[in-house]
């Protein structure tokens, strides 16, 4: 429970924030440029947020397909394709493509996630037409040269080695595999080494045919980009894309309570992730779970925050239980993961760390306070708005939301959705998703003192603990 002083401070802060919200703050959100959306005859969607005052723009293609659209046999093909797409097209050699981008002063990039693949360019507004042409070319006309494919294997294998050195990446890959076994959502994005060594031109071509269709793509523009002009460019450069069979259909994965531990006693830091099943993008519980995650908050000893706002952060700081922790709410089209990622050098007190973490989770279901919820909502709204600083983050949000919701949620609408979350909403979702629910545990490093699965699981019910 918050101390009396903290409760008083919270109430004062909430009153002052409410006063600010009632005047200029909502008005500023309403002044954000409207997102314009057009669907072309072949099913391709074009979405833009135009700001003519800027000199730059981000244009990109968001594709409703990632590693979740793969099988065990071709796991890694989406990421492999992202690499090989930049190795030359029927019109442009690899060096010609690189020189063209360099001469514009632009940046061409791509990334693959579990449910989406993204190709985008950051450039001056006068080069938007060139950027869209390049994106259309690499997505539809890549040569997929067998020699380039073989050369790229070594690059991706080195990338996989680097990923394996990043413990956080390893933990979250294991977390997905443990929580969603025998489902493509549990696959890694890079795929196993065996697949990287054997994926062929035919595998890449089949993936393109099945997934790179107009109805699964959104062409996005943010910054100094004209919507009508981008629609014309999309029609010219993507108008011949086949329509496809509609949105990808996945089997909803069954969340599995599980425990994966990789004990390495000579590592200095224990890395631990605890997660329960979360909600999908479109679930009404998505926003209360985000607020609940913000209430658990984050902590970093190196940041030197003497007065952390979350109760768990206060406990961890007081007893030196962890170097850092971050609560997370990872969302997918039909499920999610809600949990916490912790790093700790205090290997002998991991039992206390697990105890206080789960205790705070249980408190969300039994006794969250008005002050805590109000502060968490303000922090969440701030973080969501600060994440939109620049044309590329705006483009990413537009693309992600168009694929997830079929529309863009404006900053004002998101602000209202967060604001509408009540203490009772937090208690309800905590009881539904967290209290007495199975959880997935992944721990890497010196984790001998972390309690076993059954002990942590029993603490998820206050009557049994």
From Swiss-Prot:
Pfam families associated with the record: Peptidase_M16 (PF00675), Peptidase_M16_C (PF05193)
UniProt binding sites for Zn(2+): 79, 83, 159
Inhibition and activation profile: Binding to the alpha subunit is required for catalytic activity.
Keyword Protease appears in the UniProt entry: yes
KW Hydrolase (keyword) present: yes
Keywords tagged on the record: Hydrolase, Metal-binding, Metalloprotease, Mitochondrion, Protease, Transit peptide, Zinc
Enzyme class: hydrolase
UniProt cofactor(s): Zn(2+)
Active site annotation, chain numbering: 82 (proton acceptor)
InterPro entries in the record: Metalloenz_LuxS/M16 (IPR011249), MPP/UQCRC_Complex (IPR050361), Pept_M16_N (IPR011765), Peptidase_M16_C (IPR007863)
Catalytic activity: Release of N-terminal transit peptides from precursor proteins imported into the mitochondrion, typically with Arg in position P2
Subcellular location: Mitochondrion matrix
Subunit structure, as described in the record: Heterodimer of an alpha subunit and a beta subunit subunits, forming the mitochondrial processing protease (MPP) in which the alpha subunit is involved in substrate recognition and binding and the beta subunit is the catalytic subunit.
Function field: Catalytic subunit of the essential mitochondrial processing protease (MPP), which cleaves the mitochondrial sequence off newly imported precursors proteins. Preferentially, cleaves after an arginine at position P2.
Protein name: Mitochondrial-processing peptidase subunit beta
Species the sequence originates in: Blastocladiella emersonii
Recorded name of the encoding gene: MPP1
């Amino acid at each position: 429970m918050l101390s009396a002083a903290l409760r008083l401070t919270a109430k004062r802060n909430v009153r002052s924030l409410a006063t600010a919200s009632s005047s200029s703050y909502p008005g500023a959100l309403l002044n954000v440029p409207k997102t314009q959306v057009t669907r072309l005859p072949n099913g391709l969607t074009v979405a833009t947020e135009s700001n003519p005052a800027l000199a730059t723009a981000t244009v990109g293609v968001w594709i409703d397909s990632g590693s979740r659209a793969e099988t065990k046999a071709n796991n890694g093909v989406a990421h492999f394709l992202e690499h090989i797409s930049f190795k030359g097209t029927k019109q442009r050699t690899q060096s010609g493509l690189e020189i063209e981008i360099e001469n514009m002063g632009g940046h061409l990039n791509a990334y693959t996630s579990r449910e989406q693949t993204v190709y985008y360019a950051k450039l001056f507004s006068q080069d938007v037409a060139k950027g869209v042409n390049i994106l259309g070319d690499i997505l539809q006309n890549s040569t997929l040269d067998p020699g380039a494919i073989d050369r790229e294997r070594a690059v991706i294998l080195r990338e996989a080695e680097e990923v394996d050195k990043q413990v956080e990446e390893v933990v979250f890959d294991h977390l997905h595999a443990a929580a969603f076994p025998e489902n493509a959502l549990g696959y890694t994005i890079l795929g196993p080494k065996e697949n990287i060594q054997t994926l062929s031109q035919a595998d890449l071509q089949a993936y393109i045919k099945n997934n790179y269709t107009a109805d699964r793509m959104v062409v996005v523009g943010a910054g100094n980009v004209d919507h009508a002009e981008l629609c014309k460019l999309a029609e010219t450069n993507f108008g011949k894309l086949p329509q496809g069979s509609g949105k990808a259909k996945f089997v909803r994965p069954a969340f599995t309570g599980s425990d994966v531990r990789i004990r390495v006693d000579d590592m200095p830091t224990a890395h631990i992730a605890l997660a329960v099943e979360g909600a999908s993008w479109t679930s009404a519980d998505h926003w209360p779970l985000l607020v609940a995650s913000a209430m658990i908050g984050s902590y970093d000893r190196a940041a030197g925050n003497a007065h952390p706002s979350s109760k768990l952060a206060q406990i961890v700081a007081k007893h030196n239980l962890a170097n850092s922790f971050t609560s997370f709410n990872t969302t997918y089209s039909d499920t999610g993961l809600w949990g916490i990622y912790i790093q700790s050098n205090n290997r002998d007190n991991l039992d206390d760390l697990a105890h206080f973490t789960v205790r705070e989770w249980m408190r969300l279901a039994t006794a969250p306070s008005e002050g805590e919820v109000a502060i968490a909502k303000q922090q969440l709204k701030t973080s969501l708005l600060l994440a939109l600083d620049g044309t590329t983050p705006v483009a990413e949000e537009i693309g992600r939301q168009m694929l997830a919701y079929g529309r863009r949620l404006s900053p004002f609408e998101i602000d209202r959705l967060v604001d509408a979350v009540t203490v009772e909403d937090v208690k309800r979702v905590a009881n539904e998703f967290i209290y007495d629910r199975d959880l997935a545990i992944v721990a890497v490093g010196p984790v001998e003192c972390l309690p076993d699965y059954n002990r942590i699981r029993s603490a998820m019910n206050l009557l049994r603990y």
